[in-house]
Amino acid sequence: ATVTNAIATLRGGAKITNITANCSMTLSCCGSYGGVPVILTCGHGGQSPNDIIKYASSSGSTIGNVYIHRYYDGDIGDFEIIKITNTDTFSTSNSINNMYSITGTLSSPAVGTIIKYYSRTTSSFGYGSVERRNVTVLADDRDNISGLTEVKVTSGSCESGDSGGPFFQDASSGAKYCGVLHGKRTDSSGN
């Protein structure tokens, strides 16, 4: 949906589109980088810094441009940081789909930790357990991306367009942000 002359709130789980790469993905979380408001999503949904990111679809309002892009052979992680340049239209929230508020981070979840994620394409939450850490995968049949955490999904599904979405731990003290959904299956058992 196009948002004009009003403040729209960006939050984890929202649909965003890289119009330069013609790719829809999911917003992971909002924050700031060097004092600048930003959003975080997957790196494999884009091509390079300065790609244009829009809210919802290619006809939506422009959010901003890719500021930092990580998704090349030998990179650690699969993410990009988008600088919000349209601050007259967009505000940010630390919530995930208006259901969970991010109260902190869990940057190194231990093996066995139960992790939740949000599937934008099915409008549902799923979960799984951390199987391995610091995993390297062959992405797009050509690039080795390392530093990933492998989660065995035991409930829910991940579809095309869910990439970039939030992974988090649902703790009694609030949701702890863990990272960005990469969405690559490593085998047929749900990993």
Model-derived regions: residue spans:
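Residue-level marker for beta-strand->alpha-helix junctions and adjacent short loops that shape enzyme
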Residues: G46, T122, G174, R185-D187
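Autoinhibitory propeptides
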Residues: A1-A6
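Membrane-proximal bilayer-interacting regions
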Residues: A139, N144-V153, K176-N191
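Serine endopeptidase catalytic core focused on the charge-relay Asp
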Residues: A8-G147, Q169
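Short, Gly/Ser/Thr-enriched beta-strand-loop segments that form substrate-interacting elements
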Residues: N22-S24, K152-S155
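Catalytic nucleophile loop of clan PA
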Residues: G156-V180
